[in-house]
Amino acid sequence: MPIMKPVMTPDCTFSQEHIELLGIISEGRMFRIHKARRGTKYIILKSAVRNDAMTTEFLRREYELGSTLSHSSIVTTLGFEEDTPAGPALILEYVEGQSLDEFLSAGPSDSAKDCIIDDILDGVDYLHHRGVLHNDIKPSNIVVNPHGAARIIDFGLSISDDSVYKGCMGGSSGYSAPEIMAGKGPAGAASDIYSIGLLIRQMSGRKYRRIIDRCCRHNPTERYQSIPALRRAIAHRRYLPVAV
């Protein structure tokens, strides 16, 4: 696939300002996440550990998908530039907060956890309505801000209806649906719903036990088939005085 010319963020004044790297937040096998500043704004840079054509194209693809998304529960993609202090990089909104694991370690209330569940469902429902599967829903890809609102991040493994990557495995072994781990690729919304079920188990396992069991069935056709269906089941459970 040919490498395209650099894509700049639409805000030309913002894009021409110098980027100052402030530190590495995390580093994986392929990518580094940097906190940075451009002018007076904090931003996130996602750059390749090994700068080559393949990883640059992955970053560009993530930009092309992320730039089409706009939702309060999804991190904003600002641009992609090849000439940054970190090399070719995806430029993202900086979200102050902590990972879902860190948030849960503080022992939040049931109502606070329910708000997080609702935010995740809102964000994933928006993605699915736009023909996008996140394909890597896990605690480290959920950021909780100081107000207790959740944002979904990292669309590097996401798949859209017109994607040439539909058959890719993707996901993280601890949270991926069985069909993905078997190399069959995602089974539509049901694969993201499997991962959401595991997140709900981690947050409120006892409260939503039967709902989780259905989310996490091995056969994707036996799971909830859409976020609205899952949302209705959760709303019904919250209304009941005892576990169902």
Please annotate each region the language model reported:
Residues 99-109:
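AlphaC helix of the protein kinase catalytic domain
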Residues 53-68:
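AlphaC helix of the eukaryotic protein kinase fold
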Residues 116-117:
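Activation segment signature within eukaryotic-like protein kinase domains
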Residues 85-99:
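Conserved short submotifs of the Hanks-type protein kinase catalytic core
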Residues 192:
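Conserved catalytic-loop aspartate of Hanks-type protein kinases
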Residues 29-57:
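ATP-binding glycine-rich loop module of kinase domains
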Residues 76-88:
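Short beta-strand micro-motifs within the conserved protein kinase catalytic domain, predominantly
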Residues 128-144:
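Catalytic-loop of the protein kinase fold
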